[in-house]
A protein has these predicted regions:
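Phosphate-end processing signature that detects enzymes handling 5′-triphosphorylated RNA
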Residues: 1-137
Length: 137
C-alpha cells in the first residue's frame, strides 16, 4: 500500500516562511534545489458524495500542466493510504489506482460518474531534505 506521512506547519506571513526556508538548519539538510510547481487542484466525488462518505479523497491535480490523480484513504495518526496515477483520463487513472492497491470499490463508484466538488490554484515551493538518513520530499 502507498503510505504518506504528512505534517503541515503554518507561518504567520510570507516573510516568516521565507526565513524558515533560508534558515541554516534547513539548508544543512536540503539535498535538492528549491523548485516551484504551479498546481491546479480539483476534488471529485459521486453525485451522492459516496467517496467523501467513506472518508476518502479523490483528487485531480495538474502539476506544471501534467495531470496526477490521487486517492487518499484514512490511516493511523499522521499516516494514510495514498496512491497516484499520471494517466490523463479518469477511467484509466482509476484502473491504475486500483491495480496499485487502492480500494477496489473506487472503480465501482467512479463508473457511476464523478464531478468536481471544489478546487484551488496555488504555487508550491519545495525542496528535498534528508533527515536522519531518510529522504524527504
Amino acid at each position: 500500500m502507498g503510505k504518506e506521512i504528512e505534517i503541515k506547519l503554518a507561518a504567520p506571513d510570507a516573510a516568516a516562511l521565507e526565513a524558515v526556508g533560508a534558515d541554516a538548519r534547513v539548508e544543512a539538510v536540503r539535498t535538492g534545489a528549491w523548485q516551484e510547481i504551479r498546481m491546479v487542484t480539483e476534488y471529485l466525488d459521486t453525485p451522492d458524495r459516496a467517496i467523501a462518505a467513506r472518508k476518502w479523497t479523490l483528487r485531480r491535480r495538474t502539476e506544471n500542466g501534467e495531470a496526477v490523480y490521487t486517492i487518499k484513504t484514512p490511516g493511523d495518526g499522521y499516516a494514510r493510504g495514498e496512491w497516484e496515477s499520471r494517466k490523463e483520463s479518469l477511467h484509466e487513472a482509476v484502473r491504475e489506482l486500483v491495480r496499485l492497491g487502492a480500494p477496489g470499490e473506487l472503480a465501482e463508484l467512479a463508473a457511476g460518474g464523478v464531478s468536481r466538488t471544489c478546487g484551488v490554484e496555488f504555487l508550491r515551493r519545495t525542496a528535498e531534505l534528508t533527515l536522519d538518513g531518510t529522504r524527504c520530499a
